[in-house]
A protein has these predicted regions:
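A generic structural signal for short
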Residues: 48, 71-72
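Rossmann-like dinucleotide-binding domain for NAD(H)/NADP(H)
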Residues: 66, 72-153
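Rossmann-like dinucleotide/phosphate-binding beta-alpha-beta segment
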Residues: 1-65
């Protein structure tokens, strides 16, 4: 959905392939190429051994355009200290996240030092908790329970 909204604003969207993998189709771009060309980089991947600290000092060094980095994946996908260093060094335009390596965010998390920066935004990871999202969740649950009961009578 992020790509759809970005395209509506006239943005060119690059979808990254997994690190080290050749693009599987024309819709995918090599990870390093995305890093080199992104003005805005949003993260939407699961946390796994392959994605832990996916964004780190080395990957930030490959970012040629000083992008805005948005992490809505998992906290561990981003190396907090690398982000802090990049903000201080002007390598990132800004940083936004609703996820942290430890939740709630630890008081000694390096990201806490950015809390008052003008281009840094931290929000709680609870978009699922809106009234509409909860109604939809309960509706889906009711449908699944009903289907289970009807199919097992």
């Amino acid at each position: 959905r992020v790509a759809e909204i970005a395209r509506a604003f006239g943005m060119t969207v690059l979808i990254a392939e997994r690190v080290g993998q050749a693009p599987r189709s024309a819709d995918y771009t090599a990870f390093d190429e995305v890093l080199a060309n992104a003005d805005i980089l949003t993260l939407h991947c699961p946390l796994s051994p392959e994605t832990t600290h996916l964004i780190n000092h080395d990957t930030i060094a490959k970012m040629a355009k000083r992008p805005l980095l948005i992490n809505v994946a998992r906290g561990g996908v981003v190396d907090s200290q690398a982000v802090v260093d990049a903000i201080h060094q002007g390598k990132l335009l800004g940083y936004a996240s609703d996820v942290f390596e430890q939740e709630p965010m630890a008081t000694d998390d390096p990201l806490m030092t950015l809390a008052t920066y003008p281009r840094v935004l931290f929000t709680p990871h609870n978009a699922w908790g809106s009234a509409n999202a909860q109604r939809k969740l309960w509706s889906i649950l009711a449908q699944q329970v009903s289907s289970f009961i009807l199919n097992h009578e």
